[in-house]
């Protein structure tokens, strides 16, 4: 006690500057600052005050006489005054213990109007701060039930802290100081100049608004700090809640943390969170922020997350898009088997492996059977994983007045928009008209160009009627045939076919970088609002906003329903009677958008992409020049040329001429029209034959298709007859040639590449006009052989087909009898002539006949020939010699063209070889000929297929070695299909490069 009494005068005599320099004075200080002992942190930082404190002495403590000249007298005076000082000190201590004031010496506690308040002992400058103090500021809601408005925030400090004694005000104008939070501590700062004796009114703020201008207390200066929220990295849920809490009205029983967006039921839990877990605790010196502020790698195309609480940098736009899904909760990739949703494609593909492990090679969703797990996995990725990563805002335009926005996947509009990427067809009456730029883009992508229709031709694509099941996004044939490189039925002065149904707008898609997958991001763009199925969308679905969309559970239920409906759709007319097809009414296989071919089997799709797709072409063969004969219908002879006499056709004897007469049933079909085989009516054009929705049988390949669209695709891309070039007609008719013609003539001039199945000489030359051949038409039962499914059905209907009609520019049907080359046809091989290479012998041939003859007679790798079997003879009957000779002599059948009479004089084998059978084998009729053929071979030369029912004949594939590929172990029912296989698809061509 005495030491403290003695030290008191010494401390008062020292200047405040000396007090700042000496630490021992702080320990022995007995001034009212010592009463702040409950706050252990306050004395350490309270000591450096503002400059005005240096020349102002605390008035509460009386200053003893100062006489530095006589220290002895001063000590004597102290000894004399000691009892009185002791009494005063004791009184002061008692008053200090009784008084609740524990604040700084610049302030004092006062009573005004019966209320405690704090006033300034001396003038306080703006920017003066006190702190730090242990506590926090809690946001409180304004209760509407309270009559008196209270503060929106609450000060939470220790009960003994003097900050609780400061009267609080709500407005900044009424306050001259503020309490704010900084670095997990509370600070009190003077915001306005307070005169001596003035009262302090404090306002609670969550963060400082202005920078203090006090030059001494720079450590407490919050001016250079950014708002707390910008340095906090919150979770997406916290960020959203924190943005709401900034302006939210909070109940009294809820204690939220505005920085983190977390609500607490107890104030103690909130305090613990604020002290130890709050995100605002992260400051520059903390280890968490140190890890945040470490230098990050920079990328040339770096993207930054727009969320202010996240600010994650992504190396690319795609990675930013994937990252943004973590904020929005978007899961655009859906497994259609179990309806699981994923944020990234990789996760969805990884999930699909679960189904490959459990399905044992069978897709339980669509019944697809695969031999390996990899093929099944590719099938699942291609067909049972919805969506591709990409900006859906680029492929959906809600309208002219609305900007393109990215729709969330849990909305109906987003799901329907995405499903358009996989929908097969868009009806013409609902689909928007794509812009010309988009059309040109689609045309180049599909590997063909389109020209406008000629002479009133149908500008739209004739497609199957709506009663036929729509399984694939195939563009109908007439639209394809209108391109410059298409051998379609588009010819000058062509009228629309009466059988053409309503046009259908076909969705155009681009090929994806992933084989068999859906289009890549941004690849599908259309102008206007896309068509959306009516049974899913409302009429005003184009303007449907996202907030009114149904829940995600409804979307998943709709997806499940669509999947089950798709599984229940059979091969019949699922779209009949106006039944909507659905979003997933397309084929269960895969579609090659470059070739516009849809496969029901994923294996066929991959084989097509690897071996036959038009995208495999060499770079020097661009898609736009693949088919140089655009609308060059005049390149063929005019309509009147159908009756010109052809010297090469005028063989000696009436029999061949009668053959020509009866063989001209349909000049367009006979001359290699695309619909040449099986014309429905003699006078119908090729357009009528090909566009007939009921036509599904390819007689050249003996394949019957379930849909007309598949049939047209087959005729365009895969038919054995499509590779035959339209031969040029002779410039002028000549006299009849000699009795014999060369066996192998020069191939015709090629006008495009990749027509190389049957290089028949002058196939399609006009029939002779001179002589009695064109006039009489023998109603022989064999006249209907090439075009009728039943060889025994006799008909005299082909006669009207002799009327002149334009010959279409199309391939030749192999099931018809080829015509010989005119002797004056050009013999020089063009630069792009076909060549055929024998892999085993490394010998190239420019003629298919020479190549087949080599493979038949000379090639050591050729399979051993078995004895040919005649389909019209008993099963044990053997054919001596050539099967073609046997059919012509024994049964009176002309393989490719019907004979005029059973006893017609046959031509020499050398003359028949290039015309009837290039390899000595007779191409069979694609129809079940044995049903109406004679069973007795004894009546040779007089029997025709209409003589009576035959004996049981071998199966169509039982034609011996004629239709059996030993290397591939495949038996064919049609010779033309077998030849096409040997030329294009056989495994022996794996190492060849056939131009």
From Swiss-Prot:
Any keyword Glycosyltransferase? Answer: no
Q: What is the effect of changing residue 339 to A?
A: No effect on interaction with TACC3
User: What effect is documented for mutating residue 350 to A?
Assistant: Abolishes interaction with TACC3
Binding locations of Zn(2+) 2: 592, 595, 608, 613
Changing residue 347 to A has the effect of: Abolishes interaction with TACC3
Per the record, where are the segments of Basic residues compositional bias? 1-14
Q: Where are the zinc fingers (CCHC FOG-type)?
A: 249-282, 584-617, 690-723, 830-863, 957-990
Q: Which SMART domains match?
A: ZnF_C2H2
- Which segments show compositional bias classed as Acidic residues? 67-78, 86-95
Q: Name one GO biological process term.
A: negative regulation of mast cell differentiation
Reported effect of changing residue 354 to A? Abolishes interaction with TACC3
In which tissues or organs does this protein occur? Mainly expressed in hematopoietic tissues. Expressed in the spleen, a primary site of hematopoiesis in the adult mouse, as well as in the liver and testis, but not in the heart, brain, lung, kidney, or skeletal muscle. Among hematopoietic cell lines, it is strongly expressed in erythroid and megakaryocytic cell lines. Expressed at low level in several lymphoid and early myeloid cell lines. Not expressed in mast cell and macrophage lines. Expressed in the heart, where it colocalizes with GATA4, GATA5 and GATA6.
Q: Where in the cell is it found?
A: Nucleus
Annotated function: Transcription regulator that plays an essential role in erythroid and megakaryocytic cell differentiation. Essential cofactor that acts via the formation of a heterodimer with transcription factors of the GATA family GATA1, GATA2 and GATA3. Such heterodimer can both activate or repress transcriptional activity, depending on the cell and promoter context. The heterodimer formed with GATA proteins is essential to activate expression of genes such as NFE2, ITGA2B, alpha- and beta-globin, while it represses expression of KLF1. May be involved in regulation of some genes in gonads.
Question: What is the protein's name according to its record?
Answer: Zinc finger protein ZFPM1
Q: Which gene encodes it?
A: Zfpm1
């Amino acid at each position: 006690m005495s030491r403290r009494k003695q030290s008191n005068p010494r401390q008062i005599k020292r200047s405040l500057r000396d007090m700042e320099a000496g630490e021992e004075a702080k320990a022995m200080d007995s001034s009212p600052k010592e009463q702040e002992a409950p706050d252990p942190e306050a004395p350490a930082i309270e000591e450096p005050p503002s400059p005005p404190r240096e020349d102002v002495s605390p008035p509460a403590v009386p200053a003893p006489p100062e006489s530095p000249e006589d220290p002895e007298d001063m000590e004597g005076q102290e000894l004399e005054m000691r009892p009185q000082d002791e009494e005063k000190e004791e009184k002061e201590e008692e008053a200090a213990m009784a008084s609740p004031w524990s604040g700084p010496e610049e302030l004092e506690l006062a009573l005004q109007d019966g209320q405690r308040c704090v006033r300034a002992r001396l003038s306080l400058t703006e920017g003066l701060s006190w702190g730090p103090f242990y506590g926090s500021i809690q946001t409180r809601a304004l209760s509407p039930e309270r009559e008196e408005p209270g503060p929106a925030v609450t000060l939470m400090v220790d009960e003994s802290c003097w900050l609780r004694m400061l009267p609080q005000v709500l407005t900044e104008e009424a306050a001259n100081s503020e309490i704010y939070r900084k670095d997990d501590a509370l600070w009190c700062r003077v915001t306005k100049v307070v005169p001596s004796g003035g009262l302090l009114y404090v306002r609670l703020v969550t963060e400082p608004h202005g920078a203090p201008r006090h030059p001494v207390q720079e450590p407490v200066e919050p001016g250079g700090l950014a708002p707390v929220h910008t340095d906090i990295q919150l979770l997406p849920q916290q960020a959203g809640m924190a943005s709401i809490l900034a302006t939210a009205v909070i109940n009294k029983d809820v204690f939220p943390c505005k920085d983190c967006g977390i609500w607490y039921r107890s104030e103690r839990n909130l305090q613990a969170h604020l002290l130890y877990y709050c995100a605002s605790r992260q400051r520059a010196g903390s280890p968490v922020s140190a890890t945040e502020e470490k230098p990050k790698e920079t990328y040339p195309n770096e993207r930054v997350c727009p969320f202010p609480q996240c600010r994650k940098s992504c190396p690319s736009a795609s990675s930013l898009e994937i990252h943004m899904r973590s904020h929005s909760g978007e899961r655009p990739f859906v497994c259609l088997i179990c309806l699981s949703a994923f944020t990234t494609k990789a996760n969805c593909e990884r999930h699909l492996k679960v189904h490959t492990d459990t399905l044992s090679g069978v897709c339980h969703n669509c019944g697809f059977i695969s031999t390996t797990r990899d093929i099944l996995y590719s099938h699942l990725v291609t067909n049972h994983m919805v969506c591709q990563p990409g900006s859906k805002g680029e492929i959906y335009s809600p309208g002219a007045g609305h900007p393109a926005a990215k729709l969330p996947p849990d909305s109906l509009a987003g799901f329907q928009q995405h499903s358009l990427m996989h929908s097969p067809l868009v009806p013409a009456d609902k689909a928007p008209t794509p812009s010309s730029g988009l059309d040109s883009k689609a045309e180049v992508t599909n590997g063909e160009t389109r020209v406008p229709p000629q002479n009133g031709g149908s500008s739209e694509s004739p497609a199957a009627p709506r009663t036929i099941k729509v399984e694939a996004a195939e563009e109908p044939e007439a639209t394809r045939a209108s391109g410059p490189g298409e051998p379609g039925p588009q010819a000058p002065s062509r009228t629309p076919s009466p059988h053409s149904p309503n046009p259908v707008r076909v969705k155009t898609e681009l090929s994806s970088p992933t084989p068999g997958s859906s289009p890549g991001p941004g690849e599908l763009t259309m102008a206007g609002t896309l068509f959306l199925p009516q049974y899913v969308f409302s009429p005003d679905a184009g303007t449907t906003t996202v907030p009114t969309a149904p829940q995600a559970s409804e979307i998943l239920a709709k997806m499940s329903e669509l999947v089950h409906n798709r599984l229940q759709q059979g091969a019949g007319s699922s779209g009949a009677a106006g039944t909507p097809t659905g979003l997933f009414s397309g084929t269960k296989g895969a579609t090659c958008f470059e070739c516009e071919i849809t496969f029901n089997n994923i294996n066929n799709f991959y084989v097509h992409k690897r071996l036959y797709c038009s995208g495999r072409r060499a770079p020097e063969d661009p898609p736009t020049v693949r088919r140089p004969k655009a609308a060059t219908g005049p390149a063929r002879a005019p309509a009147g040329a159908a009756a010109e006499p052809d010297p090469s056709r005028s063989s000696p004897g009436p029999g061949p001429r009668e053959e020509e007469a009866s063989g001209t049933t349909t000049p367009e079909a006979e001359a290699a029209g695309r619909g040449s085989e099986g014309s429905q009516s003699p006078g119908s054009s090729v357009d009528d034959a090909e566009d007939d929705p009921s036509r599904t049988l390819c007689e050249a390949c003996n394949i019957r298709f379930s849909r007309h669209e598949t049939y047209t695709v087959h005729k365009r891309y895969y038919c054995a007859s499509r590779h035959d070039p339209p031969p040029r007609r002779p410039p002028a008719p000549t006299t009849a040639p000699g009795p014999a013609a060369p066996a192998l003539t020069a191939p015709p001039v090629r006008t495009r590449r990749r027509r190389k199945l049957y290089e028949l000489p002058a196939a399609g030359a006009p029939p002779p006009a001179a002589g009695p051949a064109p006039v009489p038409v023998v109603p022989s039962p064999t006249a209907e052989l090439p075009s009728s499914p039943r060889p025994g059905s006799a008909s005299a209907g082909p006669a009207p087909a002799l009327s002149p009609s334009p010959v279409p520019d199309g391939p030749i049907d192999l099931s018809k009898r080829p015509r010989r080359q005119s002797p004056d046809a050009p013999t020089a091989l063009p630069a792009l002539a076909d060549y055929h290479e024998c892999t085993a012998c490394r010998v190239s041939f420019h003629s298919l006949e020479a190549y087949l003859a080599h493979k038949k007679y000379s090639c050591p790798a050729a399979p051993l020939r078995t004895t040919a079997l005649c389909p019209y003879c008993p099963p044990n009957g053997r054919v001596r010699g050539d099967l073609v000779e046997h059919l012509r002599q024994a049964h009176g059948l002309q393989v490719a063209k019907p004979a005029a009479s059973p006893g017609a004089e046959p031509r020499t084998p050398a003359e028949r070889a290039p015309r009837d059978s290039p390899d000595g084998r007779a191409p069979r009729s694609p129809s079940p000929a044995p049903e109406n053929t004679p069973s007795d071979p004894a009546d040779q030369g007089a029997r025709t297929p209409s003589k009576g029912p035959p004996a049981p004949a071998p199966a169509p594939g039982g034609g011996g070695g004629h239709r059996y590929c030993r290397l591939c172990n495949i038996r064919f029912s049609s010779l033309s299909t077998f030849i096409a296989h040997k030329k294009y698809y056989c495994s022996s061509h794996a190492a060849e490069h056939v131009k």
